[in-house]
């Protein structure tokens, strides 16, 4: 069972105050000793002063944390200092368990495999605190391996109280599904943009576990003859550092009526079927799009499909001219 070394209330208060007044602040695990394949969350309540997050740096290594996710929440999933937020893995009966967010979750940032720091483009920021829907930051750390010593994995966040003219958000395209034994399979998802926004994608990130070979994201526009026109957002080997990298076309825009899609190529050389899930023995198919808007960002930033074998672009989404 993980053991927790709690910070004092004075230390927490000092940290919360520094978040409002400093240009760089940290959110860290308070000395946890995790078991293998554990997902742990800790949260920070934001002040009434609006802030704009403009940069992120992981304070860990891939040998310690498998990945780190930073969520913006209206309310955290728990009032505990640290809690088990691995909703898809086996629960620990002796540890408080809850989702990452109690309401209105929004993925802000993701890190894995020794990815370098990320600085957002000039004049772009994630709006948090104040009158925004994000009243708390929640950091989720996936520890793939158990640890013997207390761990303080965290994130260094660059922020400013100066309003940024372009608001940032992160969209996640993700699938479920099953990867059959001794087979290479394609996992696909596609969603129509239904909200009245103009998205300017500037960075993308891919994530799978060890069976991932390639992950790509595409913008699809349909013409009056119902012919689909595909434009690459980004394509990457998920075994490389899982950093946010620039999109292929920085002038690209995604608008109401367009379709965003993602595809993961996974290769299974094992004599067992592999399900999509949270543990080291499962797989994942994730494609993140970081974008900015001149006005409000989208309310729904998740695109999900059940994945293979139940979902295919040509069959369920009725897409044509699909790239290889």
Curated annotation (Swiss-Prot):
Keywords: Copper, Disulfide bond, Glycoprotein, Metal-binding, Monooxygenase, Oxidoreductase, Secreted, Signal. It comes from the Eukaryota. Its cofactor is Cu(2+). It is found in: Secreted. Residues 1-22 form the signal peptide. Glycans are attached at residue 182. This is Probable peptidylglycine alpha-hydroxylating monooxygenase 1. It comes from Caenorhabditis elegans. The lineage of its organism: Eukaryota, Metazoa, Ecdysozoa, Nematoda, Chromadorea. The gene is pghm-1.
